[in-house]
Amino acid sequence: MSPIRGGILHLPPSHESRYSQSLERGLAILRAFTPDRPWLGIAEIAEVLEMSRPTTHRYASTLVALNYLEQGPARKYRLGMRAGDPGRSAVNSTALRKLSPHCLGDLRDRSACTASLAVLNGSDIVYVDRARSLWQSQSEVSARLGRGSRLPAGHTAMGRALLAHRSPQEQREAIDTGGDQCVARAASTATGKLLEELGRIREKEFAIADQLHVEGQICVAAPLRERSGEVIGAVDVAAPKTTFSRTRILERLAPLVVASAEEMSAHLGYTPPR
């Protein structure tokens, strides 16, 4: 008989004294979430793990409090910020990668800037794809970025566009655990001010990062939505500050990025509310 039944590992008596069943059950709940079932209710989790509903609810409530799970509509749960959201990120990356060659290439050509696409994974963004500009010189830092590269979400335009649509708890978690790289010198990265900025980004639907990660580079990003309206990724362009003034950014690049994000969201099945 397999030692794993209902997602729970059953050890022989000789090992039980060194084994924490509570920890194992908590981890089993996290493992119950997969790319095919990103949202689960208490009854579904209890059935998968063969646990009682009261016990499952107690563990789930603890995981929510610790930000390993988050509770959404209809009392469903999904992996939270601290869980790293591997299942959801994998699904999002796959769906977005199918769109990226055409859409990113088109955005790059229209903006004459390098265009990128990323998803949120824990407190970082993970690059899904990039379309590099043939006319724009790349800094050493920017040139190293490619598929799979990670950056602290709060330090990037795409990260801020994504965090703007997460819960306040998740926003603070990402900011607190995002490290203190080169952006520490920018006053706008103070936690309180950044949280306020995320609120403004949510309203205007695009984010601007002025030399936050790469010296001399301004990035403009907008969120991508799937069919349900959930923000699952972000797209951006990276422009040299010597070429693009802030006025030109707002009047030319921001509308291009937002339009590209809307086009990609439509391909993902999203229809804006009327």
For each feature predicted by the language model, list its residue ranges.
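Juxtadomain coupling helices with adjacent low-complexity linkers
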Residues: 192, 199, 204, 215-216, ...
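Amphipathic alpha-helical effector-binding/dimerization core
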Residues: 78-177
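N-terminal helix-turn-helix
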Residues: 2-97, 262-270
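Sensor-regulatory modules in signal-transduction proteins
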Residues: 224-227
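Short, basic/aromatic recognition patches
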Residues: 99-107, 175-221, 266-267
